[in-house]
């Protein structure tokens, strides 16, 4: 409420928000029993502007276009153009479907996504970046920890609970969220033969996931844990939640290559050696019928109509990942050293050597951080206790032979050392 008393006059008016008098501001806008000054209006505008900016890209109908989505993905994920295009179109269509569902009699079905690619090629990062662009609740689940309801392990409904927690229990927002299920290749059917024992972490989990992926009203205990009769449940409709499943699918390339062997017939036919092509190249030839042979049940494959395959990251792509994205590893370590007042430099040869080590380890982009930690560990340990260090240079020898990075001292320190000697 505005204060009606002032130091110079009883009629002086004050801003109800910051308390400044009408003489201290340019304008004071009156409302029913309240006043707001021009400075507070400006502040409110800034807050609204920031909030609007943080909600990500929005086109005329509230959904970013596929090109806009792909452009933002390019800032964070290097390469994988085909996968980015597939994801951009699928996500755009999914949220366009939600925004226009009541405007027509034609019911548009949901298109969940399956990402297939080698370890460290960017599957998880793609899903995380999508959620950031769209400003929707996002959660990740590890398929290896899931079991059928009633067995030791996590129920599939715990995934929805995590999504609820990510949205601070806003059920309406949850029902437009994104769930990324990692390691989905680890819940494949253990055997083609019927077994006396129940497969609770393989086919059983696939069966349990079918319902929430297709769309059901899940009863989720608000505080987590096991369900009990006296507990109140939150009802969450999963019909409009977008599910993205990802996995390395090691061994799937052999099934694809085996299927392709029959195509080379006759004396002039070209028969390619499967080993001559990379895993990512073989994944490009994937057909939906290859997945049941790998161990996914046909009903589960049917719930994932959009399939995007990712390729192996080559040496050039790994060097780009180290230096170019917004959160590039080199930029992160340079910032750490900058806090100590030291410049960190990597030579071109050093970056190439790091990329080669990651390829040799077969860990993709995921292995880059551990390699960087190994190289810089001793330097980061000693640096806070050293005086006069101006720059740290990581060269090829530091990567390949375990030599310490070069330390460059300031001129003042050099002169002091010369005087002391």
UniProtKB/Swiss-Prot annotation:
Gene3D superfamilies: 1.10.8.60, ClpX chaperone, C4-type zinc finger domain, P-loop containing nucleotide triphosphate hydrolases. One of its GO terms (biological process) is cell division. One of its GO terms (cellular component) is HslUV protease complex. Residues 3-56 form the ClpX-type ZB domain. Zn(2+) binds at residues 15, 18, 37, 40. One of its GO terms (molecular function) is unfolded protein binding. Keywords: ATP-binding, Chaperone, Metal-binding, Nucleotide-binding, Zinc. ATP binds at residues 118-125. SUPFAM superfamilies: Glucocorticoid receptor-like (DNA-binding domain) (SSF57716), P-loop containing nucleoside triphosphate hydrolases (SSF52540). ATP-dependent specificity component of the Clp protease. It directs the protease to specific substrates. Can perform chaperone functions in the absence of ClpP. Belongs to the ClpX chaperone family. HAMAP family: ClpX (MF_00175). Component of the ClpX-ClpP complex. Forms a hexameric ring that, in the presence of ATP, binds to fourteen ClpP subunits assembled into a disk-like structure with a central cavity, resembling the structure of eukaryotic proteasomes. This is ATP-dependent Clp protease ATP-binding subunit ClpX. It comes from Cereibacter sphaeroides (strain ATCC 17023 / DSM 158 / JCM 6121 / CCUG 31486 / LMG 2827 / NBRC 12203 / NCIMB 8253 / ATH 2.4.1.) (Rhodobacter sphaeroides). The lineage of its organism: Bacteria, Pseudomonadati, Pseudomonadota, Alphaproteobacteria, Rhodobacterales.
